[in-house]
Amino acid sequence: MKYNKFERKIAYLLTKFPGIKLAIKKMYQRVNYLRYKKSYTFKSDFTIKRIGKDSKESYFGYYDKSPINNTNEYIIFQSTNIDTKTMPEVKVPVDLVVYDVSNNNYEVVGQSYTYNWQQGTKLMWIDEYRFIYNDLDKSKRQYISKIYDVKIKEIKIVHFPIYDCSGD
């Protein structure tokens, strides 16, 4: 950062008085912040649009996955009536939602009993139109995963849970 001659001269004179120098420096920074701050608190070239229901809390899951499919047509996420500031409830499932971007259609396509607030159900796209998520087979008392195809609206059951998938 470059300082002008006046700023350097003042800084040199104040080296003998570190307490005063610190106070003046903070005041100078505050004045410059107020003088040059932007007139807005948030600026975006995009429109922000809510896609979940007002009465529910919605979330996707972990940061390493994208909720948007490769064709940018669909967004997947989990939705719940539970306050996500509290512990998940074992007997209460989360809804699995597919949002169709082209026609603004919000569709609950399933539910899952195996989730947490940080990673969700490990919901993730495995190709352009299919995603996978974890669930519980209550009759067999077994963790499973399910693959949902948004084009043919069909679910395939995999008899083990997943943590991650690759495109191979």
Predicted segments with their positions:
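Sequence signature of WD/YWTD-type beta-propeller architectures
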Residues: M1-D168
